């Protein structure tokens, strides 16, 4: 299976989220940050174990570390050929530089996020629309070969090049959602309902009443950022209420790093094979993705994604 866009990979999830489907049948697709190519493989292996779709997210920092947008995109294409049974999307996360985002589209990313949430409403609309128009028409995979996520409202916390103090956060205003989506033409909307980037000092207080109002305003995918540290029961409630994409970054870094540290402690000093050091990290990531697939009710949903893809415009 080729790389999919977020619109394609979440068609079935969004259908269930925006109709009177039984809340127990709804599910969200997990979106996970990576910093290295072995982590990319671990993400896909975890999804394969659960027959689930998955979204691989690269920050600009991760892209710089790996080498380039083109290198990341080529790695994703190779992984897609190696694991054809796993539907997945390559996503550029929280990008603010318009030219970098457009370069990612041309390089072969199948979803990009324009984060203009710290701008005023009209500027956010203008930038998000510019990226949506470009992405929908300039992907190497053809028309609609790249989809777009934007953010309305601001999460507190630190996400590499985006930093918002707790005092500066702003919840998503439901009254602005329909206008924002209609005027921009985006495919997924990241909402601010009480989560934050990074680890929490205390459990977040998610405003479920706000999520309910936002869900009524649009029929595109809703995205929950700041998934690290959110209690399992809150995840389940978000999914039941119509969240279609859930982002996890910081927590996954800890899972990987803890496994690598443990491997280093247990290996003899005469062992120099780096695969025995980073290999446990890759396995730990796969196990975490398998667990999150169950939590998000996404396990076993790969066939539904394949069916949903047929209802979207085919890519060249």
Q: Where are these predicted regions, by residue range?
A:
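Alpha/beta enzyme core
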Residues: 7-24, 35-62, 69-85, 89, ...
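Terminal or standalone catalytic/regulatory effector modules within metabolic enzymes
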Residues: 26-28
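Thr-Gly-centered strand-to-loop micro-motif
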Residues: 224-226
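Active-site gating loops and adjacent loop-to-helix segments of metal-dependent hydrolytic enzymes
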Residues: 263-274
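His/Asp/Glu-rich mid-to-C-terminal helical/loop segments that flank catalytic regions of hydrolases
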Residues: 283-299
